[in-house]
Amino acid sequence: MRYNEKELLSLSRQRAEKAAELSMRGPKKGSVLKKRLVKLVVNFLFYFRIDEEEPIGALLLEHCRVSKEDEKGFSIHFIDEPEKKYMFECSSQEQCVEWVEALTNASYEFMRRSLMFYRNEILKMTGKDPLEQYGISGESRFQLENASL
């Protein structure tokens, strides 16, 4: 997927849902853990050299798996490229758990599925589709393959 560099740079400067200095190792063979400022903005994970304002890279958190590797470490790999694994090390076990949860919940697909779950719960309780008032209940992006509304 192609991205406009200026748009990504602008997005990287927005308020982060989560940010911290983490040790990070890229997917290339022989790469080593390096301290990076890591920022989660919407469904992008930006990483920066410490004390630099422009990101050196970004990961779109779609079609990927976030896995806890050990007490303080987690990884991100993409479903269509499982051999490409990004490794991260946190300063504590608690920080690691927080990052894994935040990254797992950041994808558009997770948010869409959450919306569908709560939409169905409201429909069961009230008998009304909460998206109808916005005129968007029939849009394909709000449909699950096996959902029956």
From Swiss-Prot:
This is Pleckstrin homology domain-containing family J member 1. Disulfide bonds: none annotated. Pfam families: PH. SMART domains: PH. PANTHER family: PLECKSTRIN HOMOLOGY DOMAIN-CONTAINING FAMILY J MEMBER 1 (PTHR22902:SF9), SESQUIPEDALIAN (PTHR22902). It comes from the Eukaryota. CDD domains: PH_PLEKHJ1. The lineage of its organism: Eukaryota, Metazoa, Chordata, Craniata, Vertebrata. Residues 15-108 form the PH domain.
